[in-house]
Design a protein with these regions (language model features):
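Extreme N-terminal starter segment of soluble prokaryotic enzymes
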Residues: 11-15
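N-terminal glycine-rich phosphate/adenylate-binding segment common to multiple enzyme folds
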Residues: 90-121
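Divalent-metal-activated hydrolytic enzyme cores
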Residues: 9-10, 25, 55, 65-67, ...
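Short, positively charged and aromatic/hydrophobic N-terminal segments
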Residues: 3-8
């Protein structure tokens, strides 16, 4: 369930979800992060799948990216921050147009992580913080959960 700022359950009709959680093969390695609990939760709802990294033109498969000091960079050192932020802006416009109240995004992703992301050293080390899309949605006042939040409530 998703809750508003008053901790009231809201009835969700339209929701954005990280496409990889729905089984779309859009991960950096060409795979997915299919999450059966997410799929079950969104049954009967109008779902808009999103992948900022694909929308940014990074391709499938692609070189991994991480967020360090607010800049999105590939493992090979190429900065892709502008492309990611442009994709996030497009997603935000769609969210507003579609009147979406809630998002369920992929935990720890550099674009979609809500509570923690990898620290930008490409060493597998986590740090507190949100990915670019998650932070933009939170800043705009949307309810944003990651898939692990959903698992904790069920």
């Amino acid at each position: 369930m998703c809750y508003n700022a008053k901790n009231e359950v809201i009835a969700l009709k339209k929701i954005i979800v990280s496409a990889c959680l729905l089984g779309e093969n859009c991960k950096y390695n060409g795979g997915n992060n299919l999450d059966a609990q997410v799929v079950e939760f969104v049954k009967g709802r109008d779902v808009i799948p999103v992948c900022p990294e694909v929308l940014a033109g990074l391709g499938i498969p692609r070189i991994t990216i991480e967020l360090k000091d607010g800049i999105v960079t590939r493992k090979d050192g190429v900065v892709v921050d502008e492309a990611i932020r442009k994709a996030v802006t497009q997603i935000l416009a769609q969210v507003k147009e579609e009147d979406i109240e809630c998002a369920i995004l992929k935990a720890r992703s550099p674009t979609c992580g809500v509570h923690q992301i990898y620290d930008g050293t490409f060493s597998g080390t986590l740090t507190d913080g949100a990915g670019v899309l998650a932070q933009a949605l939170l800043d705009a006042g949307y309810i944003v959960w990651d898939n692990e939040d959903l698992e904790e409530t069920q």
